[in-house]
Amino acid sequence: GLGIVALSSGIIVLYANSFVMKNRSRELGLYSVLGLEKRHLFSMILKETMIMGFVTLLLGIGVGALFDKLIYAFLQRLIGESTGLVSTFQVMTIPIVLVIFACIFGLLVLVNGFRLLRLNPLQLTKDGLKGEKKGRFLVIQTLLGLGTMGYGYYLALSVQNPVTAIMSFFLAVLLVILGTYLLFNAGTTVVLQLLKKKKSYYYKPNNMISISNLVFRMKKNAVGLATIAILSSMVLVTLVGAASIYAGKKDYLASAAPHDYSVTGTNVDVTSTRKVMDDFLSQSGNQVNRKTEVTYLYFGIKEQENNKLTIFSENERKVLPKSIFLVFSQATYKQLTGKDLNLTSNQVGLFTKNKTLKDQKSLSVNSQTYQIHDSLNDFIKGKVPNLFTIIVSDYSYLVVPDMDDFQESIKGTATTQSTYVGVNVKDPTHEAKKNSDLLDKLTDKETQQLAGQTTGLPKSYFTANSRYDAEGMVNGFVGGTFFIGIFLSIIFMLGTVLVIYYKQISEGYEDRERFVILQKIGLDDLQVKQTIGKQVLTVFFLPLIFAFIHLAFAYHMISLIVRIIGVLNPSLMLVVTIIVCGVFFLVYVLVFALTSRSYRRIVSM
């Protein structure tokens, strides 16, 4: 977080500095003509930067300390803790802030000093009026931009595993950023040149003026537009991810902790698991409202070829599985759903997230073929926890007629038996922490008493879970993640607004004299407004279109990444994405309207 904030601050400050120095070029040139040497100008800029840096740091640290308690109270509210105006301001962080901003303002001094050394007085006086040079190798840059962006999109769409998605995400982001800058730098110029060659379109007063203005300074426009597109994409991606995580925590809790208290026995029979739960209920004095006891198998898929599945062998080195299977007997299925499948020896029922298996009529598991008798719904949701949804995006529940026969058919494979006993109690909030700690102690004690399981990671063990612990963990993690997401979104949004504002003001001053000349040669006020409107629309909504396209291609990868954090409802994430896009569009249009008014006012002066 610190690195992202520091980098964002540096980019915003550098962009604002380029705007200010561009508009001061004539002033500095005049000082030089009047007799000031470059060392005098550099000394003046150095002192101005030091004063500006000191005032900025003083105000920033002061405002940060002032609102520290309020921000911390907001964070406490998000993570579900009792709110209070407690200060978290730490004096030891001030030197870190001072060093970061000293580096940023030191870089400003170097950039401005190099600019003074490079330009002579005459160049300084004309620098603000000078157009940008036309770039070289525009077609090659355009093709390279399309290639890098296309490959970034391919990475985002092709990844299927949540863990792999995290590793691929940053490479995809870098490729898309590079492609965006190349396309804005070269691709827009190529398109404008093609429009210039189209006489029926170009030789109209409004079109000619707008296109000529854009071509005249396209290099600078390209950097600004690409920066707006990237910052807007960052806002959208961060907000969609953070809001989806916060909105999806209830679904995750329902999946991770369907009961108030539960015990899971790994490679332990259900009688032993039930005994641990009974001991807990006896010692805690809780009265049971509902109880669920389930025995099932689970295993990872090593290879999949259409409907043919291969399970990892027992002594094989495990890697990340392509899919996870949970296997239940039809008796357990009837217990959970109240429905009887009436399966014969070679028939199975199947619920699957695996796209390849959804339309299959048969299924082969380690060369044993079964007919898929029924395609099932998610019958364990809210009844048995399935944390494997975090590891893989596709998982399956298999219902077999007889568990013993199925185990015999896959003998020698890496399968694990799990027994789950979960209870809902009459008053789940009564001494919830004390009860949760008691259940943890009981499961640890019973695990140690299992034969040969006293050291290391046991092959057979018990694990405890409670809704109280799950809620505390989820609220803390999700609330903190949401807070960071909102914080970063605000930073990116401020960066976007500032870049848009400086861009409009800068271009307004540059265009003013040109539009005065056009009015003098016969362009009326209506034509001036139409020309300005078309140019501003092009400049502003092109980055927004790119940002929405970036988000559309990143959506699949974002959904995989937030799955690890617990967002298990795709429909909910889609609704959140639409709302975020709608709100961002309204904010963007508002900024567009306000800055366009400033642009028109400057041009019309």
Feature names for model-found ranges:
Residues 1-29, 49-63, 143, 177, ...:
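Hydrophobic alpha-helical transmembrane segments of multi-pass inner-membrane transport and secretion
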Residues 51-195:
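Hydrophobic alpha-helical segments
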Residues 61-93, 150-167, 542-605:
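Short helix-loop junctions at transmembrane helix boundaries
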Residues 135-139, 148, 183-232, 510:
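N-terminal Sec/SRP start-transfer signal
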Residues 174-193, 250-276, 565-601:
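Alpha-helical transmembrane segments and their immediate juxtamembrane interface regions
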